[in-house]
Amino acid sequence: FGTKPYDESSFNDKNKEFGFEIRYYKGHLNKNNVLLTQGVDAVCIFVNDVADAEVIRVMAANGVKLLALRCAGFNNVDLNAAAAAGITVVRVPAYSPYAVAEYTVALMLSLNRKIPRASWRTKDGNFSLHGLMGFDMHGKTAGIIGTGKIAKILIHILKGFGMNVLAYDLYPDYNFARQEQIVYTSLDELYHNSDIISLHLSLIH
C-alpha cells in the first residue's frame, strides 16, 4: 500500500530471486480499502497507512499473517491488536546513520541561509538579499539533544564546520565527549546557550 514507482522497481528487482505474487496499491491502507487484503499472506505499508484495531481485525479475518513496514516508526500500527490477532509485525530496524546526519546538516544550512526562499525568489527574477541573511556556522554553538549513533556522526560533522557543541543525554558518553571536545550540560543551559538545536531522541509520550 502507498507505493511509488521506486517501491515497485525495488520490490520487482528483489522478487526475481523469489517469485512472489505482489500486488501494488497507490492508495494508503485504511478501513475503507482493507478488503483488498483478502487472500494475501503479507501486507506491506508505509508511514501514512493506518493499521488500527479495526483494520487489523479485518486483515486477520482475511488471512494476513505478516505486516511489514517500509519505515522505522510503527506508531500507525496497533501492536496489541496485531499480537492478539496473531499477525507478526516487522519494520526497518535502522536507516544509514550517515545519511540521516548529513541530511540534518543540509536542513540546518537551508534554514540558516533561507535557501528554499532564495530559490523561489530567484525563479521569479528577484535577487534581493532582504530577509535572506543567515550567519556563519563557524564559531557558533550547536545544542544536540540525544547523543546516539546519528547524533554522534552529526556532531563530528559540525565540529568540522568549526562549531562548538553542547549536548544533553540521559546517559552521557563522556569518552565520546573527550574525543570530540564537546560538553554535556543541562537542558536549560543548552537552550540558553545554543544558536542551533537539533533533536535526536525517540518520541516520548
Predicted regions located by residue number:
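An N-terminal-biased, well-structured beta-alpha scaffold segment characteristic
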Residues: F1-T88
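Structural detector of well-ordered beta-strand residues that form the stable sheet scaffold
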Residues: L66-A68, T88-V90, S128, L166, ...
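Short gly/ser/thr-rich secondary-structure transition/capping motifs
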Residues: R23-L29, V47-N48, R121-H130, A177-Y184, ...
